[in-house]
């Protein structure tokens, strides 16, 4: 390896990786795992095809990881945050801001276990029971927190922003509609998620407003990636 070149020059393989000590450590570690993958995981024929450029094997530097993760907020809502190797555990959140903090920390932890993106299902629907009764201004402020907390977390692999996306359905999906809604403190609210459709739409509208406005420099947000579900 050209260790000096890796340390002094920015990573050209992934535009999301900054040029920092953490990033160069990632690049060096990936190089070792790429060699391992070519020698021990793939056949000689496949390895040679990759080296010649006939094919491209993506993310070989993460050969010991699954690619992507997609999960619901419901587990965090019900059980709180208790990460392996963490010196502390948190009970279920009683406030939306605390649930968001759990979500971001969990996403950061998951990013260390997967090679690709960390996705979240029906985010506006899951948060809706926590936002019921809030005014538009409060919901807009929470939407700003949601997007900025993810976009400014340069703590993932190599000091990247967390590669995450948010599923944002226009209406409560069928798989959640008749499910008992979990609210503050991990408790059953006595309602179904379909009863919170108005709250979920208000949050969705607020999130889209924040994306349209951009960050403090009027630049677009690259993360978290919004995925609008229309059906």
Q: In which residue ranges do the predicted regions lie?
A:
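Conserved catalytic cores of very large enzyme subunits
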Residues: 1-231
């Amino acid at each position: 390896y050209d260790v000096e070149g890796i340390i002094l020059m920015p990573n050209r393989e992934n535009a999301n990786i900054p040029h920092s000590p953490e990033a160069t450590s990632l690049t060096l570690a990936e190089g070792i795992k790429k060699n391992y993958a070519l020698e021990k995981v793939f056949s000689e024929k496949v390895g040679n095809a990759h080296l010649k450029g006939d094919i491209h094997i993506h993310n070989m530097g993460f050969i010991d990881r699954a690619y992507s993760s997609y999960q619901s907020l419901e587990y965090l809502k019900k059980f709180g945050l208790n990460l392996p190797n963490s010196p502390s555990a948190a009970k279920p959140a009683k406030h939306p801001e605390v649930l968001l903090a759990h979500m971001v920390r969990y996403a950061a932890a998951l990013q260390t276990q997967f090679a690709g993106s960390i996705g979240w299902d029906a985010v506006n629907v899951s948060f809706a029971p926590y936002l019921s009764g809030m005014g538009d201004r409060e919901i807009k402020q929470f939407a700003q927190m949601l997007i900025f907390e993810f976009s400014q977390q340069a703590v993932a692999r190599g000091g990247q922003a967390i590669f995450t996306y948010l599923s944002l359905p226009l209406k409560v999906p069928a798989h959640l509609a008749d499910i008992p809604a979990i609210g503050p403190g991990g408790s059953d609210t006595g309602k179904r998620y379909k009863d919170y459709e108005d709250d979920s739409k208000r949050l969705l509208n607020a999130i889209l407003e924040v994306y349209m406005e951009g960050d403090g420099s009027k630049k677009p947000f690259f993360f978290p990636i919004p995925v609008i579900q229309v059906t």
